[in-house]
Structure formats: structure tokens, C-alpha cells
Amino acid sequence: MSDEKTEQPTDKKLEDAHRDGETAKSADLTAAAVLLSGCLLLALTASVFGERWRALLDLALDVDSSRHPLMTLKQTISHFALQLVLMTLPVGFVFALVAWIATWAQTGVVLSFKPVELKMSAINPASGLKRIFSVRSMIDLVKMIIKGVAVAAAVWKLILILMPSIVGAAYQSVMDIAEIGMTLLVRLLAAGGGLFLILGAADFGIQRWLFIRDHRMSKDEVKREHKNSEGDPHIKGERKKLARELADEAKPKQSVAGAQAVVVNPTHYAVAIRYAPEEYGLPRIIAKGVDDEALALREEAAALGIPIVGNPPLARSLYRVDLYGPVPEPLFETVAEVLAWVGEMGASGTPGAEPQH
């Protein structure tokens, strides 16, 4: 049936969807970018963050409550909170920037409020049931299960690897605990980023496939869009005809005036040859045309009394020469015969034997 959506979406269909805020993207890829950027940031600034983290731990554990305990505790908490904010704010800014870049890399720049508009279908129970049992929902469920199993397995494996460090931290100093904590955090971010990168790459492929699938078109929609884009075929043909007429009018009008002869095909081609040694050392093509243009050149030549020579092979060969260009060397002999015949005819006033074709 023509209503079945079996055709791939056109470029215009995809552009319209993008303009409406509908794009293929994977949240897992964005999460991977954030986690890996966090890992890289901590690895590059480990010494700075380590010092600040140790200072915070010292501040939290070294509270002198011998005098004014309540005031001392308030000051300590306020100072601790301020230092924590100052330490995490740049990290949060970097994470937000990386998340935006990762999303932009997948979707491009999208400025649309349509995705947040209220749609009646969203509160329609029938539409809700249809969405629940849709292919996209089933795929999302499978992805959720796979992601949960993968994350659980990765966390368990990481715990087994890091368990000695975690247990040993109980016997370490505060400074050593801070260093161990930074190392564990970097490893966690690296492992999480790698896992979500793999999941995100697969998810992006799935999202792209679903996006194309959801925007498939019927044959009628493709025809209608093509008609709207290109216009009605009859009108399009009229436009082309008008464009040809305007192009013909814009062409400089050719004339055979000054030519020694016009070589014809006999009706399809007409080429005017001029030979004036004082102007140019070789014979030149000063006018040429096919069909209607050829007929006009023949009529003008007849009116001006310029000899018309029927030589189909020569006419076709000369027509391929650029306008106002010289006669090519392979045609010298044949053109010379034509010009000699024209000269004899002009000298005697009566036509002689036409040159052999």
C-alpha cells in the first residue's frame, strides 16, 4: 500500500526533524565523555587536588573545641563548605562544558522549543500503551538490563581489585588516605568512562537506526515532497523553456557578413568561414549554428550573396571549432578547396565544379 512507510527519509525530512529538536543521540556517550574528562582532569591536577583534599581532612579532624565549642564548630563547617565549593566548582564547570560538547558533537546545534511543548498524544492512554509496547521501548528495556549487568559486573570486579587498598586504608594516616582516595577515584572514573564509552557507541548506533526508522516515509509522501520542492512537472517544463528562450535572447546575434563561404550539412549545420590574410593568417569561423540557427545563417548568406557549400563532414568538423577560432590543421586542405572554388566562382562570375565532398 502507498500509505506504508517503507521509504528512507529524504534530506529535507531529516532537516525538518532536526529543526524541531528531534535528533539521534546517546546519553551514555555523554556520560562517558564526562567520566573520562574527570579522570583526565584529576590525573593532570592530582597534586593540587591532593593538597586541597588533605587540607580539608585536616580541617575536619582538627577541631579545637576547648574554647567556645559551638562557635568553633560553626566556623569549621562554614570554612569546610566554602573550600569544598571552591574546589568542586571548577570541576563542575568542566563537566558541564564537556557534556555540552559531547551532545553537540552528536546532534549539532539545535535551537528548538518544540520538544518541551505539550502534546495531547502524551496524555492519551491509547498512545501511552502504544509507546509502552513499541520497538523503542523494548530496545530501551534490553539496553537497561544489559547496562545494569555490565555496571554491576564492572563494579564487582573493581571492588575485588581495589579491596586491598581499601582495607589497608584503615591503618594509614590521613594524608595517605587522601592519596589513596584520589587514586581510587581516578581508577573508578577511568573504568566507568571506558565502560560507558563501549555502551554509548553501541547505543548511538541503535539510536541512529531508530531515528531513521521513526522518520521513514510512504511513497506518496516522497512524491508529494518532491513535487513541493521541485514544483509541478508541467510548470517546471515551462520554466526550463522560458530559461532557454531567455538564454537564446541573451546570446549575441551571429552574422555571416564578411564570410567567403557558408558550409552546410545541408540543413542541420551551418558554418561561416572568413579568410582575410591581412587580419589573421588562417581562415576563421565567424558564425555557426544548428537547426533554426543554421537556417537563419543560410537565409542571411543567400540574401548577401555569399556562396553556400554543401559538405556534411566538413560542416560537422568545423562546427566543433570554437567560434572565432582558426580552422584546425587537419582541415586546411578541404577548406582551401572550398575557398579556391569560391574564388574561381567569384572571378568568373559563374559557379565552377563544387569541391569534392
From Swiss-Prot:
SUPFAM superfamilies associated with the record: EscU C-terminal domain-like
Top-rank lineage group of the source organism: Bacteria
PANTHER family cross-referenced by the UniProt entry: FLAGELLAR BIOSYNTHETIC PROTEIN FLHB (PTHR30531:SF12)
Function: Involved in the secretion of PopA, a proteinaceous elicitor of the hypersensitivity response in plants.
Subcellular location: Cell membrane
Annotated transmembrane regions: 29-49, 84-104, 149-169, 180-200, 323-343
Organism: Ralstonia nicotianae (strain ATCC BAA-1114 / GMI1000)
Protein name: Hypersensitivity response secretion protein HrcU
Keywords attached to this entry: Cell membrane, Hypersensitive response elicitation, Membrane, Plasmid, Protein transport, Transmembrane, Transmembrane helix, Transport
Protein's GO biological process: protein secretion; symbiont-mediated perturbation of host programmed cell death
Matches recorded under InterPro entries: BsaZ-like (IPR006307), T3SS_substrate_exporter (IPR006135), T3SS_substrate_exporter_C (IPR029025)
Entries under Gene3D superfamilies matching the protein: secretion proteins EscU
GO cellular component, one term: plasma membrane
Membrane topology: Multi-pass membrane protein
Family stated for the protein in its record: Belongs to the type III secretion exporter family.
